[in-house]
Amino acid sequence: MAGLFDSGMIGKTRIRNRLIMPPVATCYSDNGYVTEDMVNYYKRIAEGGAGAVIVEAAHPWQGIAYGSGALGIWDDSMVEGLSRLSGAIKSAGAAAFLQLGHNGPQASENQVSPSGIPYIRDTSPKELSIAEIIDIEDGFAAAAVRAQKAGFDGVELHGAHFYLLSCFLSPLMNKRTDIYGIDSEGRTRIVCETIGKIKERCGRDYTVSVRVNAREGMEGSIDGDELKAIVGHLEKAGVDVIDLSSNDVSFPAQLKRCTVGTVSIPRADAPQGIFTGYAAEVKEYAKVPVITVGKITDKEFAEELISKGTADFIAMARPLIADPDLPNKFLNGGEINSCIYCNACIGAVARNRRMVCTVNPDIK
């Protein structure tokens, strides 16, 4: 059985250990362009011993993100800054991946969705035509080419948390009656075709991850059977790893603003490893590696997840924001600057402000 600090493979990319920094928005960008603050932030996480860093969602189009602090990849002029970013991460020994995302019905303007169903109340997202869907697939592929030119080891398609691709995957949000809906094959088509286009343009060996919701916590949404079907279709399309999140944390207060009353962020009182049971479920049938996430904080717990085969890799977001040296401290010992799960980091970004951290004085 593998150990927490054994290397592992994601596609053709070797990862030095099983600890991964997942994509979390920082608002450190300057109108889409990489800044020195962003480079330093991610380099610091890599220096702390993470096996891989998945950089926050970069947007292949203007006008689909939250604001000026969101990272972009819509123009060739952005490649230079992204190259500095990937280079800084890899110089510290971590693999570098870049998430690609389209906010869809959660965009600050020009909201779109598979079926015109809103995520944010009092908005009317446009239902995408087939021609527009194909353009979006091509836009993701063009962004992947830029990411490859910038030196990233691979890309991740953001298919979770009710952003655009997530809405296509979800029976709750996708009510289309054409080839991009109806059943799991149709609902996954946009993601599968995008994987194919990325592999065609970047090479079959270029690593592609897809982040998906294991559950969505509402009637008519993704359940265990639907998840199994989604993973099967993604594997046939050539996905290299499943980054398994979930969106079934009950949050009724959100219904004042949104049409969905669940979120992906475990609260402070949530049990450790809240989503890891879903990873164990997927490991029963998946042929590609599985990344798990969800309030994983203790070394012994993390070691057990890997040694028992619950997951192949562990993503730790808020714990690595609070203490980027956590992987090295797991390995060598040392007092950990523990996350208190106050969500100051996420709250700031949700207001389109720079990430802050209550317990890490370097993030302010």
Task: Tell where the protein language model's regions lie, with residue ranges.
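Flavin-dependent oxidoreductase catalytic cores
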Residues: M1-K364
